[in-house]
Every structure is written in C-alpha cells, then in structure tokens.
Amino acid sequence: MKSLVLLLCLAQLWGCHSAPHGPGLIYRQPNCDDPETEEAALVAIDYINQNLPWGYKHTLNQIDEVKVWPQQPSGELFEIEIDTLETTCHVLDPTPVARCSVRQLKEHAVEGDCDFQLLKLDGKFSVVYAKCDSSPDSAEDVRKVCQDCPLLAPLNDTRVVHAAKAALAAFNAQNNGSNFQLEEISRAQLVPLPPSTYVEFTVSGTDCVAKEATEAAKCNLLAEKQYGFCKATLSEKLGGAEVAVTCMVFQTQPVSSQPQPEGANEAVPTPVVDPDAPPSPPLGAPGLPPAGSPPDSHVLLAAPPGHQLHRAHYDLRHTFMGVVSLGSPSGEVSHPRKTRTVVQPSVGAAAGPVVPPCPGRIRHFKV
C-alpha cells in the first residue's frame, strides 16, 4: 500500500513538472513602493504632462496596483494604476513637475486616476496604453477644510470670460512688447465677499505691438510661439470694476518639424482660437507619441466648433482615452486580464502584521 501511495505521489510530481507553462500566463506583483514600480509610475506621469494640451501638470500621489507580465520574445509589460494630483504649473510652463507645487485642498484640489501599460525593454520604459480621468474634490470636502473658500467656477461662465478679457486688455495696455491674445481659460473661482472673480488663463504672442494694436483680427501669431500664463482678479466696486493682473511670459518655442502619425493632420484641428469666445477643451488628442520621445513644443488645439461644455476643469479623459499608443515597439500587446495565475514576491517569516504590497504610500494627501 505504501508503495502504491509513493507511486501516485511521484506521478503527480512528474505531471506538475512536465506541464507546459505558456508564455505570459504568470504575472508577478511587486511592491507598489519598489523603486522599479515608482520608475514606471514616473514615466507615466511624464507621459501625461508631455501630451496634455490643456490645463495643468499632474504629479504622482499614490500607486494603487501593479502587475508585471513577461513578454515574448523579451521584455516585461507593467500594468499599473496610479492616482495623481493637479499642480499649480500650467502645461506650457517649462518648470519640471518635481518643482511644481501641488494644489492644496482649500484651493479646490483636482485628482486624477490613471491606468497605464508600459513596456520595459533593455531597462527602458515606453507607454503603450494610457487611460485617465480627473475630477475636482467635492464641495463638501472643501468646506470641511475651509468654510469660506471659493469653489471652482465653470470656465464658460460669463463673469469668468469677462474677467479674463478685461485682465488681458489691462496686461496689453501695460505691455511694451507684443500684443497678446487669449488662448485658454484654465481655472476660475467666484469670490462672494468682497465680490470678485479670480481667473487663470494663457495667452499667445502676436506680430502686433501691444500699444499699437487696435484690431486683434489683423494680428497673427508669432512663427516662434510665445506663450504666457496669467493670474487675475476682477473686483466689483462702487466706482466700477478694478482689475489686478500678473503674467509670466515663457521663452519662445521654435516650430517643430517632427513627423506626425499617418492621419494625424486630419484628426487634429487647426490651432486657431477665437479671442471673442471662451476656449473649450478638446474632445481628444489622437496620435499621442510614446513616452521617452523628445518633448515637442506644446500645440494648443482649437476646440471643435460649437463645443461649449459647462465644466470647471479640463478632464484628463478627453486626452487619455485608453487607445493603444502608436509608438508601441511592437504591433501587439498581450491581454493579461484573461489569466489568473499570480506570483507574489517572497516574504520571509517575521513577527508582527504583514504589510500589503499595495496600495503604496500617499505622497501628498488623499482627495
């Protein structure tokens, strides 16, 4: 009887040993705070900020989950979920995101949620899939932190548009250089007491002289793009409105001749903005380049005609819609969600509670 049991055990062991292990059927789950995992997440953050045509740069807040799948014939595919936070740096601002301040809760913070797939080959990451969305913190949560702090206002609110135009006119009147045109209204808040409108917006330089320009329609954008970022407050007073505005003008950006994916010219609208209409976010930005490619100068996309949305921020989902990147090193990406086998990192026996590998640490605060 003992011999029969031993024979059955040996047969089972041999069956396990000889069973085929198909490529890509087993994934590993490293710790969300491992250096390699964080490196992948930071590449994803760079990808967001290099390709976001509107709004503000985002920074990494937390890594929620990571799975690593072997790829054939070589490399690994990192499937990662991350949380981001909006910073105070506009996407046109050349300041590295590591030096940008995170927008605080009392300022009505904005959180992003992203799913990425990154291929790692020869020690380098490249993005092959990106899907994101973002949303402002709830009014209730803002009120818990600051009862009287203003909330985000719709970007196409008539008071917001009026404040941006008045601030731009005041800036051009004080400017001895180029005349600037309104490019994008980025953020706004309506302050009840004292009654005022706070607005942040971007401008673009033209070939007209500021103090000589009388008709904006006759001014053309500079060949070497020059953008600026402005903050302004329009205060309502008994004697009339009072405008305070400060603008930071960035260095000129040379026109890039980088080749575009086939069909991209048909899909991307011409960068023309009507200064008399409040800008709106694009429906999407097709043909995004892979991460790691040279950071091209930003091109602000004109909103589709008649597309006016009643929103207070630019949602990441309009740019990162879950389309496989055209820059994927191979035409195929495995679909790992169909498999079930998982290999956990080895953990030695130790006293005390076991810390789960994910989610990772919160770098700033939870929204």
From Swiss-Prot:
Q: Name one GO biological process term.
A: positive regulation of phagocytosis
State the residue spans of region: Disordered.
Answer: 255-298
Q: Which GO terms describe its molecular function?
A: cysteine-type endopeptidase inhibitor activity; endopeptidase inhibitor activity; kinase inhibitor activity
Question: Residue positions of the PTM Phosphothreonine?
Answer: 319
| Outcome after substituting residue 317 to H | In APMR1; uncertain significance
Modification after translation: Phosphorylated by FAM20C in the extracellular medium. O- and N-glycosylated. O-glycosylated with core 1 or possibly core 8 glycans. N-glycan at Asn-156: Hex5HexNAc4; N-glycan heterogeneity at Asn-176: Hex5HexNAc4 (major) and Hex6HexNAc5 (minor).
Task: Please give the tissue specificity annotation from the record for this chain.
Answer: Synthesized in liver and selectively concentrated in bone matrix. Secreted in plasma. It is also found in dentin in much higher quantities than other plasma proteins.
Task: Specify where it is mainly localized.
Answer: secreted
Question: Boundaries of each Cystatin fetuin-A-type domain copy?
Answer: 27-133, 144-255
Keywords in alphabetical order, please: Disease variant, Disulfide bond, Glycoprotein, Hypotrichosis, Intellectual disability, Mineral balance, Phosphoprotein, Repeat, Secreted, Signal
A GO CC term assigned to this protein in UniProt: extracellular exosome
User: What Pfam family does this protein match (any one)?
Assistant: Cystatin
Q: Which residues form the propeptide?
A: 301-340
Keyword Glycoprotein (UniProt):
yes
Q: What would changing residue 248 to T do, according to UniProt?
A: In allele AHSG*1
Q: Where is the signal peptide?
A: 1-18
Query: Where does the source fall among the domains of life?
Result: Eukaryota
What does the UniProt entry list as the effect of changing residue 256 to T?
Answer: In allele AHSG*1
Q: Subunit comment for this entry?
A: Alpha-2-HS glycoprotein derives from this precursor, when the connecting peptide is cleaved off. The two chains A and B are held together by a single disulfide bond.
Which protein family is named in the record? Belongs to the fetuin family.
Q: State what this protein does.
A: Promotes endocytosis, possesses opsonic properties and influences the mineral phase of bone. Shows affinity for calcium and barium ions.
Disease affiliated with this protein: Alopecia-intellectual disability syndrome 1: A rare autosomal recessive form of alopecia. APMR1 patients show loss of hair on the scalp, absence of eyebrows, eyelashes, axillary and pubic hair, and mild to severe intellectual disability.
Name by which UniProt lists this protein: Alpha-2-HS-glycoprotein
Q: What is the lineage of its organism?
A: Eukaryota, Metazoa, Chordata, Craniata, Vertebrata
Gene this protein is translated from: AHSG
